[in-house]
Amino acid sequence: MESKLGLNMELVDQARASAAKVADDTQQFIDQHTTVTVERAVCRLLGIDGVNDMDVPLPNVVVDHLMANSLLPVGAAWAIGNAMVETGKDPQGVADAVNSGELDLSKVPAHSDAEIRGAITPVVNATMERINKNVAKRNSYLKEWGDKEGPYLYIIVATGNIYEDIIQAKAGAKQGADIIAVIRTTGQSLLDYVPYGATTEGFGGTYATQENFRLMRAALDEVGEEQHRYIRLCNYCSGLCMPEIAAMGALERLDVMLNDALYGILFRDINMQRTIVDQFFSRVINGYAGVIINTGEDNYLTTDDAITAAHTVLASQFLNEAFAKSAGMREEQMGLGHAFEMDPAVENTFLHELAQAQMAREIFPNAPLKYMPPTKFMTGNIFRGHIQDALFNMVTILTNQRLCLLGMMTEAIHTPFMSDRALSIENAQYIFRTMKDLGSELTYKENGIIRNRANEVLTKATDLLKEIEKLGLFTTIEKGIFADVKRPKDGGKGLNGVVVKDDKYFNPFVEVMKGKVGA
């Protein structure tokens, strides 16, 4: 891609190399550790499902049992496989026996690795076949109906009731939306378990559960078949259960997942060691399942200034790209995030927004960039808000952003009505249609505001990444360099769920998934 901004590609290469070094150094830590939610995700992928009489999910029952008996370092796959050899039960049977007290995994005689792997491999293969069928079904729909060119129209539903969400999601799809995201209930990030079953009460969103995923997937397939369009489903694998939600999404054919390497640390005060380990397995799963991940750089601009902190967004995009590559993801699955969040009271911010978006497109040419609408400076004036969203839509189409979360004129007033979404979709469709090829007609003046701004941000981001390379990721976060938020290495939620792996440890799903996409 020819650079319209005259970007110094040597600086881009230096920034990417620094980010890769940071990711490689951090990967050494990841490879040595596992967490309770990584092992619960393994349980789920082995087919363990359901809850006990106290509504505790059985993956939690098994992993809590492993933790209490100092078995977590060997991993769920080894412990369950060993019990399968001894008892002849399948993983669900092992979980049921642990729950009833019939089976104590710490007292099962140790069998050979060959026997354990022999017992567990058919179960792993069955799960992989299920995920492969989901990938094939998505590809079949896309082959039959084609995929959309230009930006995906991306909307949110958030009623708290999955059945109400389905009504709103189907309406949004019929109005023209391409991606439906179901916002999670407030605080689900901080639950160290995944709720079970269909849910009808949430706060600011709807619980992410496997049954809710299944219900919404079926509803969107139904409306997609009516419209002859594939409607993508999005949810959120951030928080204390990142890999579990990724596993559930892979099993139920979700298409897009919010999945940032740093978001939980910065914005939910989840321990950085926990998050860094969890994000790796979640991305391995998403990569194999053909899921597009969305990263959360847009959130930095809610706590920091979008003009002065723009280089931290770019630096984080480089890091998220590097961590995704470490997990075997393809660039085409990396929905690196940024946002239209500059203060509209400042002169020439539209030019700065355009520079930032074009810069991201040129630096990450294969990534389906996720572009977020204005929220911080939405005042409740719906007329001004609609214009702010229109300017955002203009930048989207001029710079070929791919996942365009549509702004709502009623931002800062209430959760959107179906009519609000209809107007938002109409706004975007009008601009995307009438300006479809305008971006290819434009060049940017040498030494002008747009080119100078982009090169200034790139230079600062490259310098910052060189500093992070020296400091290491954990120290960088402790210093508050991202989002102006400081987090201690040994603080936050979830650190007690991180353990060093035993020599016997293995994760069969990383072995078969990493660097591959299901077929």
Task: Locate each region found by the language model.
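Long, compositionally biased, glycine/small-hydrophobic-enriched stretches that function as flexible linkers
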Residues: 1-163, 171-176, 184-212, 239-245, ...
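Alpha-helix-loop-beta-strand connector modules within alpha/beta enzyme cores
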Residues: 143-144, 194-232, 276-293, 350-367, ...
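Hydrophobic faces of well-ordered beta-strands that scaffold small-molecule active sites
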Residues: 151-158, 179-183, 229-237, 256-261, ...
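Short, glycine-rich nucleotide/cofactor-binding loops
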Residues: 156-162, 347, 380-385
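Catalytic cores of alpha/beta
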Residues: 163-170, 240-253, 308-309, 383-397
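Glycine-rich phosphate-binding active-site loops on the catalytic face of alpha/beta enzymes
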Residues: 178-189, 252-269, 320-321, 392-415
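Conserved, well-structured core segments that form the ligand-binding/active-site neighborhood
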Residues: 202-330
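Hydrophobic alpha-helical bundle architecture
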Residues: 356-420, 438-448
